[in-house]
Design a protein with these regions (language model features):
Chain A
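Hot-dog-fold acyl-thioester-processing enzymes
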Residues: 1-55, 113-137
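HotDog/MaoC-like acyl-thioester-processing domains
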Residues: 2-4, 37, 67-71, 78-137
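Short aromatic/hydrophobic contact patches that present stacked aromatics
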Residues: 7, 59, 107
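Short, well-ordered turn and helix-capping elements at secondary-structure junctions
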Residues: 10-12, 57-64, 96
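Short structured motifs
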Residues: 56-62, 74-75, 88-89
């Protein structure tokens, strides 16, 4: 599990005075980026090597709202890995009292840069589950 | 079922050259706005009368990508209505060939303007299911 | 001058209860897209033919706020055209009372798809100023 | 001058493969938030005490693009302070080679929470220019 701090931006709030529900999906994406960096193979490099992890499913439950300037923590982990898909799970908490704000998950399919489905390359799969990193030790 | 046309904006695309997955949730929201207007009680008026329909759950499946300047159609309907929640369902299609791009649903809880959960007022419930409109006829 | 209708989305509002100031720049972009379509050479085709009009300057003055669900009109025109740049100007008005909300302009440089500055192709320049369309008549 | 680190999010890129030009204005806003925090009076508290600093003017020049996952530094300062307005200036640089990507400025008018123009309260003015902090020393 990889933790990433996020501070709610004014632009992310809406007329209800709280963070808009789409902001959490952007923060999940930031969480994924940091997860892959922590695992030793940043998503930027995954893309540069010709693999995209395209979002094919999103699911999200909102428990409590977040407000402008609050510091949140996104906890990101990989829950399922198949030949061609990976499922990330997320929890977003308010940092100061650890209240759980939102839980969610995203499923991604591997494609080449032309958008055609393919298997997840072994080096990517290994880094996503942390087995790649362990092997190095 | 209420249909709303959307044209993909450049700002909604990402470095994959396709509409970012969060754009669909914004389009769902546009679909809801138009659904409530078509049912005779625009969401703006619902809020002004002291009821908010806060997003508590989102789920979304992505089948095909959308690209800049394509015209899409969001079909919005109410699937479930309980005392305190309403569930909307959406389908997003490319207009020119009717390809199904994305399906999703959102669950909303009714709150007052202070964010406290409450029952959905009868006039709002009636308009959401169309029974309010029929009564007028 | 080309007019485009925009309805303010909930996602475009912020905690002040008004449209966030960045939303207008997105609407300018929508205005440009519709301007180029009205002139007979949609920006999508400009890009497909290998020319990008990259934003190099933005300037914007905000007079009055816009609110959720209001219908706005973006008026877009080309103010200056040089060999390698084009300047668009915009006015955003509230539709129902024609109040001027925001004025702005954007300067764009022509580049190839690799991002290298180049001259604006003659067919693009002609369509931007409407001289291309006139020639057809 | 207050420096703030920003990492470019995937959601902030567009189909050109670079950060969308509106992203910089959001980063300016983050820069302002951090500027006010560094000066001892976070903007959140300014708003809570009944003063809003509404954007009335934006201007921005784009020199070089930013890409997904790059770390940028936003340098924020107050350039002009009048009775009822404050002008912030910004420079955005790529962190690793200090290349200047974007320069900009925003002008803000003070209003009460109802949106009516007012003078900037003395405590806010002092914190914006740093004279408040110095006084404490």
């Amino acid at each position: 599990m990889v933790s990433t701090e996020i501070r709610v931006r004014y632009a992310e709030t809406d007329a209800m005075g709280i963070a808009h529900h789409t902001a959490y999906l952007v923060w999940f994406e930031v969480g994924r980026t940091e997860y892959t960096r922590a695992m030793g193979l940043p998503y930027r490099q995954v893309e540069q090597s010709g693999t995209r992890l395209v979002v094919v499913e999103v699911s999200c439950r909102y428990h409590q709202p977040a407000r402008y300037d609050e510091v949140l923590v996104v906890q990101t982990t990989v829950r399922v890995l198949t030949r061609a898909t990976v499922t990330f799970a997320y929890e977003v908490r308010r940092q100061d009292d650890q209240t759980l704000l939102v839980e969610g998950s995203t499923v991604h399919a591997a494609t080449d840069s032309g958008g055609h489905v393919k298997r997840i390359p072994e080096v990517v799969a290994a880094s996503l589950t942390g087995t790649g990193r362990k092997t190095k030790g």
